Amino acid sequence: MKKLVAWFNGLSKMWKVVVIIGAVFVVIIALTTGEDEGEQTKTKKDSNKVVKTASRPKLSTKDLALIKADLAEFEARELSSEKILKDTIKEESWSDLDFANDNINQMIGTMKRYQQEILSIDAIKRSSEASADTEAFKKIFKEWSEFKIERIQVTIDLLNGKKDSEAVFKKTYPNQIIFKKVRTNKLQTALNNLKVGYELLDSQK
């Protein structure tokens, strides 16, 4: 530092002015560059924020129509399954155990397919990034549909002499009537909030 001061003092008056002006220019350029980089960083962050907001998943009109159609098909299979099971228990001539097994297995498979089709909708898969209504629908629909499917599976298992699944089912759902009623009401509310335009069969009773 002393050498630099000594060198500067040894310069002529004109060269001292030149050195001072040069130093000022260097400082100005450094400050300007820093501001530009800061502005670029801010712009990049703002841009990322806009992209993130724009990519927020939302249920489309097509998605809502699919939910409505799949729910109708899901409940239709449930009704058919219940009728087959009741008639088999009553030992109706047209519905023996072999017939019940074949048809109930098909019904359960179809119900699971419709369940997964709804849960595979992009906005529902990414519900944590979507609206609170979408998140609520996903949670309650999964609980409601799993209960419906398991209840049919347990009944056909009992007809086949398999009692283990009933014990598990009763432990999972200690009060089936209340569980069904509460989940039905919550799911209907979720459907109404999303404006799906579908009324669950249990809500019509």
Swiss-Prot record:
GO terms for biological process: symbiont-mediated suppression of host ISG15-protein conjugation. Disruption phenotype: Deletion of lntA leads to a decrease in bacterial colonization of spleens and livers, as well as blood bacteraemia. Residues 1-36 form the signal peptide. It is found in: Secreted; Host nucleus. Induction: Induced in infected host cells. Expression is regulated by PrfA and sigma-B factor (SigB). Pfam families: LntA_helical. Disulfide bonds: none annotated. Coiled coil: none annotated. Keywords: Host nucleus, Secreted, Signal, Virulence. It comes from the Bacteria. The keyword Membrane does not apply. GO terms for cellular component: extracellular region; host cell nucleus. Interacts specifically with host BAHD1. Relieves the repression of host cell immune response genes (interferon-stimulated genes) by blocking the recruitment of host BAHD1 to these genes. May modulate interferon-mediated immune response to control bacterial colonization of the host. This is Listeria nuclear targeted protein A.
